[in-house]
From Swiss-Prot:
Gene name for this UniProt entry: Cyp4ad1
The protein's Enzyme Commission number: 1.14.-.-
GO cellular component: endoplasmic reticulum membrane
Listed name of the protein: Probable cytochrome P450 4ad1
Binding site for heme: C445
Organism of this sequence: Drosophila melanogaster
Domain of life (superkingdom): Eukaryota
Subcellular location, principal: endoplasmic reticulum
Length: 516
């Protein structure tokens, strides 16, 4: 009798819970189905309509954004509703909010690696950590980081010298990624990195494997569920990579602690390049030093966010420069004005601040090819987006990849015109949200200034040394509006966009170089 009673109680609880879940889903559906969007299939929702391959997804997102006139529309993946936004007025509503700071569903695949680091944390924790790390991106700290950028950039140029001798076609995307990985690893940890020279450390290998796992889970029906993911080989790959990463970072942290102690006693008053790790080792949160786990999470976040997005931006900028020789010529002339006779000099902050036209080129490139094509927030309470009611616990996805193709804000969007961003009044009101490659509002990228300086520094070195050429002479501009279903690439060398956490080209960034 006792067992029967227990069974009845458990069954009652399960039924009660089931009814509550059903009513909750029904309530959400009642709100969200009032919003325009593609018709979902049973269970999987709109999963198949958006494509299951990295190269399909960006095209589908762009096409749906145009289909709904770049206004917000809803989609459904399994039982999770998404609100897809691409209009700056709607995006301003979200990014300006001081309460919509939570990143949940779409960032869950990063959490085994980045934990509660600055990218993935939310609420009070994020706010405290953001203030704590602000000194790491002050002008004096950036000057130290740029020494690493200049030295590694010099090694990068030496590698490219060999390719320029024969003017052979090569994939810039791959080499740029190695360069930025070397830079970010050294600036994060203080340890020399040699990815450009073909050396692969445990840290490099672990980072690559973890990026592979995140990319795989993003587009896999099976692996996106934790329980099923644990049954796959990718779970073991993730475990091995995390073990290697933590072991290597623990070693580096221990070594750096000893170095800091030695510097404090033996090198007082001497200027040194301080890596990001130093900020973490000396920081105090609520009067306490950071735990080892917190330090590892923040170093991992610094490496992840400072590697892939920067590499993507530089790679696509090289592509746009290769297809627009007149614009490239103007950028090269700007470099000559800044450096004068010392054309091989170091691009310090004073010189980088003068590279106005180069910055316009980078911003115009990011309009078309944003490194982070989608950013997301989760609303924990019901919200109103410019008159549209959105149910709580919806994942609000801002489609940065589509914003630059909206004729309402950018006339002739497939024309590469850096001067679009020259308007000095263009950083107020809605104008500030027309293009947000570094996000905006309270959760704007804390390292935006350093990211821009790094991109300008590396591109400056390349522009002063090489003429950047298309894969084949005479190629058209190669900017394709994939939001239109009838879009056909202008050549086989045009990038085939895919989303592998950051925006990449499936067929690489194919260019040639010629010494100036």
């Amino acid at each position: 009798m006792f067992l029967i009673a227990i069974a009845i109680i458990l069954a009652t609880i399960l039924v009660f819970k089931g009814v509550r879940i059903f009513n909750y889903i029904d309530h959400m559906a009642g709100i969200m189905e009032m919003i325009p969007g593609p018709t979902p299939y049973p269970f999987v929702g709109n999963l198949f309509q958006f494509g299951l391959k990295p190269a399909e997804y960006p095209k589908k997102v762009l096409q749906y954004c145009r289909k709904y006139d770049f206004q917000g529309f809803r989609s459904l993946v399994f039982l999770q509703y998404h609100m897809m936004l691409s209009d700056p007025a709607e995006i301003q509503n979200i990014l300006s909010s001081s309460s919509l700071l939570y990143k949940e569903h779409l960032y869950s695949f990063l959490r085994p690696w980045l934990g509660d680091g600055l990218l993935t944390s939310s609420g009070a924790r994020w706010l405290k950590h953001q203030k704590l790390y602000a000194p790491a991106f002050e002008r004096s700290a950036i000057e130290g980081y740029l020494r690493v950028v200049h030295r590694t950039g010099g090694q990068f140029v030496q590698k490219l010298d060999v390719l320029s001798d024969t003017q052979e076609v090569f994939d810039a995307q791959e080499l740029v990624a190695k360069c930025t990985l070397d830079i970010v690893c050294e600036n994060a940890t203080g340890q020399d990195s040699s990815s450009l020279n073909g050396e692969t450390s445990d840290l490099h290998g672990a980072i690559k494997d973890l990026c592979d796992v995140v990319q795989e889970r993003t587009f896999s029906i099976v692996k996106r569920f934790d329980a099923l993911f644990r049954l796959t080989s990718y779970y073991m790959k993730q475990r091995r990579a995390l073990s290697l990463l933590r072991s290597e970072l623990n070693r580096i942290i221990s070594q750096r602690r000893h170095q800091l102690a030695a510097e404090n006693t033996c090198q007082q008053g001497q200027p040194i390049n301080k890596p990001f790790l130093d900020v973490l080792l000396t920081a105090k949160l609520d009067g306490k030093v950071l735990k080892e786990r917190e330090i590892i999470e923040e170093v991992s976040t610094f490496i992840f966010t400072g590697h892939d997005p920067i590499a993507a931006a530089i790679s696509f900028t090289l592509y746009t420069l290769s297809r627009h020789s007149e614009i490239q010529q103007k950028a090269a002339e700007e470099q000559r004005r800044i450096f004068g006779e010392n054309f091989a000099g170091e691009a310090d902050l004073a010189r980088l601040d003068q590279m106005h036209y180069l910055e316009l080129i980078i911003r115009e490139t990011l309009r078309l090819y944003p490194s982070v094509p989608l950013i997301a927030r989760t609303n924990r309470n019901p919200i109103d987006i410019n008159g549209t009611k959105v149910a709580k616990c919806t994942t609000v996805i801002m489609c940065l990849i589509a914003m630059g193709y909206n004729e309402k804000y950018f006339d002739d969007p497939c024309t590469f015109r850096p001067e679009r961003f020259e308007n000095p009044t263009g950083n107020v009101g809605i104008e500030a949200f027309k293009s947000v490659p570094f996000s905006a509002g309270p959760r704007r990228c804390i390292a935006e200034k350093f990211a821009m300086y790094q991109m300008k520094a590396l591109l400056s070195q390349l522009l002063r040394r090489f003429e950047i050429l298309p894969a084949v002479d005479g190629l058209p501009p190669g900017i394709n509006d994939h939001s239109r279903e009838d879009c056909v690439p202008q050549s086989e060398y045009d990038p085939v966009l895919n989303i592998r956490v950051t925006l990449k080209s499936e067929n690489g960034i194919q260019i040639r170089l010629r010494k100036r």
